[in-house]
A protein has these predicted regions:
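Pore- and pathway-forming membrane helices of multi-pass small-molecule/ion transporters and channels
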Residues: 10-20, 38-46, 50, 54-76, ...
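Membrane-helix interfacial "entry" motifs
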Residues: 26-30, 74-82, 109-116, 160-164, ...
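Hydrophobic alpha-helical transmembrane segments
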Residues: 4-7, 28-37, 56-62, 112-123, ...
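Transmembrane alpha-helix boundary signature
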Residues: 97-114, 137-138, 383
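Cytosolic regulatory and coupling regions of membrane transport/channel systems
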Residues: 1-51, 55, 160-173, 177-341, ...
């Protein structure tokens, strides 16, 4: 089956208007069930804390409960791993942050310089650098490293209250356990609920796009398609381009039908797809492909692919580290005591490696959300909210964070800012100082982040696209070599690698088109030729199955690949 016509021509991506970037809800999926679980995961054990007289420990509990957000949307087959891995990182973060806080505040309270706070800045920046690299190399979904850095920085302030790393670690682990229980609870009601929800969300997104064609609607539908395939693969329903669990084949059929509708609507509406930059969910998918996608390469392979100086993951990590440390150092020099706040602000703006204009829009969202969130905290501080009502506020914050974490930055930050300030013991400080210093720290981080987007390694995208294009050619050669000695079915690893390289090349040229349109114009025809040739190889393998390739076929395929090498 030919999945792309030989004269297929992909249009250059449209660039959304900044107002669209500012106001768009990036996902139409209903998130209230997961948000309710996140709130209850904090509320129920929080009530136990209150009953036992551990009111101040509810904030440490909340640090671990964030783990439930990382598992939402994942099939139950893999959800528990997401919760436990993120929970381990959150717990390690609060323990490390508390340990560093003891060193920092021990010296400062003994008359030492405020520059001891640079240890906190270094810790959160290191976490930001490593987390940003890993999440971009693996193309993980939101929320990424943001919550881990937020609780790590907040825990550095808990040392002033006399809590030890063991104390904060125990309470955070209790929160992780609660998150695991509530995160997996719906399994007993509908074991395949996440898969069904992902496919239904795709159908709804395509339907909404048909009713009202727009760039944002197209992106929501395309992101939903990528998510549906990812969830079906994680659930073990598809693998190797085939249906593995026939009893759930109706979900695959609905996904394919929705994909066909999306391509049809794109053609009839005239809406040209955009790059991934409307949201942080990496939509590594090509809607024009009819075959069931192959799995991504192994974790180690994806990490190794990104261990190059110009890779998206490396450049993004460098920008996060530079913006974070610069804004933190300036904040310390101005006498502010939360350098981690500046680092968190830089991370939330830069952690997914946004293009320039979307990145600036996120800076506006960060400023707006932070100002509103700080204002809410000021009101809570004024009314001296505590006990049951503090728990209620924390639960509402958890609910809102889960609802909006993949939808809109500004709204997410409104809900997370009061929680972060409470974790940092800001309730015991002068409210005027808190409002002023936190606002200025956010402003410093936004300015530093905008600067690195425009001026730190601006040519890296073009170099990385050349690197990825070369990887595509090498992957084609590897697949041809495998077909000489084995069947297409047994050449699955080489087919998987080629598909991944083609999708990565497509994603990188979308970014190149946004940031460097003149360079993208020069290589656009070559990009399309590479995509056509690569998918011609994959289509051939898909049609042959267990049948060995003939030498004549391989000769013809090799001739097409050589055209890329000779160009």
């Amino acid at each position: 089956m030919s999945e792309r016509s030989s004269d297929y021509s992909e249009p250059r991506p449209q660039q959304p208007h900044p107002w669209t970037l500012l106001t768009t809800m990036h996902s139409s999926a209903p998130r209230w069930p997961g948000a309710l679980r996140a709130a209850l995961a904090l509320y129920v054990p929080g009530l136990i804390c209150l009953a036992l007289g551990y009111e101040q420990h509810m904030l440490l509990l909340a640090a671990g409960v964030f783990s439930v957000i990382y598992g939402e949307g994942q099939p139950y087959r893999t959800r528990w791993r997401y919760i436990l891995i993120s929970g381990a990182l959150l717990t390690a973060g609060v323990m490390t942050g508390n340990a560093v806080g003891h060193v920092v505040w021990g010296h400062i309270d003994s008359g030492g310089t405020m520059w001891w706070l640079s240890l906190t800045a270094a810790l959160t920046t290191l976490f930001g650098l490593l987390g940003t690299f890993v999440q971009n190399a693996l193309l993980l979904p939101p929320p990424g490293v943001f919550f881990i850095i937020m609780v790590t920085g907040g825990a550095s302030m808990s040392a002033r209250g006399g809590l030890t790393p063991w104390d904060v670690g125990q309470w955070a682990a209790f929160g992780v356990f609660s998150g695991l229980v509530f995160g997996m609870s719906a399994y007993f009601i509908n074991p395949h609920g996440p898969e069904e929800s992902a496919v239904q969300n795709l159908c709804d997104a395509v339907g909404d796009f048909e009713d009202s064609p727009s760039i944002a609607g197209n992106h929501r539908a395309q992101t939903a398609l990528a998510n549906a395939w990812s969830v079906l693969a994680s659930a073990g329903i598809i693998n190797g381009g085939r249906i593995i669990r026939p009893e759930l084949s109706h979900l695959v059929e609905r996904t394919q039908k929705a994909r066909i509708e999306l391509v049809r609507i794109n053609a009839s509406s005239g809406v040209i797809p955009v790059s991934d930059e409307l949201s942080d969910s990496p939509a590594l998918v090509d809607p024009s492909r009819a075959a069931i996608p192959l799995a991504r390469p192994e974790v180690r392979s994806r990490i190794n692919r990104s261990l190059t100086w110009n890779s998206h993951a490396v450049v993004t990590a460098q920008r996060v580290a530079f913006a974070g440390i610069v804004s933190a150092v300036i904040g310390i020099a101005l006498g502010f005591d939360r350098p981690d706040w500046a680092v968190v602000s830089a991370v939330i703006m830069l952690q997914w490696g946004p293009e320039r204009i979307p990145g600036m829009v996120r800076g506006i969202q960060r400023m707006f959300g932070s100002i509103v969130g700080i204002g809410i905290f000021a009101l809570l501080h004024h009314f001296e909210v505590g006990g049951f009502w503090m728990l209620t506020v924390l639960a509402i914050g958890q609910f809102g964070a889960e609802i909006f974490v993949v939808k809109n930055y500004a709204l997410t930050v409104i809900f997370t800012t009061p929680i972060a300030l409470m974790m940092g013991s800001s309730s015991a400080q002068d409210i005027g100082h808190v409002v002023t210093s936190r606002t200025i720290e956010v402003l410093l981080a936004v300015l530093a982040s905008v600067a690195v987007l425009w001026f730190l390694r601006p040519k890296a995208e073009a170099r990385y696209h050349s690197f990825v294009a070369n990887n595509c050619r090498n992957a084609m050669g590897a697949l041809l070599g495998a077909l000489l000695v084995t069947t297409p079915r047994r050449a699955l690893p080489e087919r998987r690698d080629l598909q991944y390289e083609l999708l990565t090349e497509r994603r990188t040229i979308m970014t190149l088109s946004a940031n460097h349109p003149l360079i993208a114009e020069e290589v656009w025809q070559r990009h399309q030729q590479m995509q056509r040739t690569g998918y011609m190889l994959l289509d051939y393998c898909h049609g042959r199955g267990h049948d060995e390739a003939s030498l004549d076929d391989l000769s013809n395929l090799a001739a097409e690949v050589r055209l890329l090498l000779d160009d």
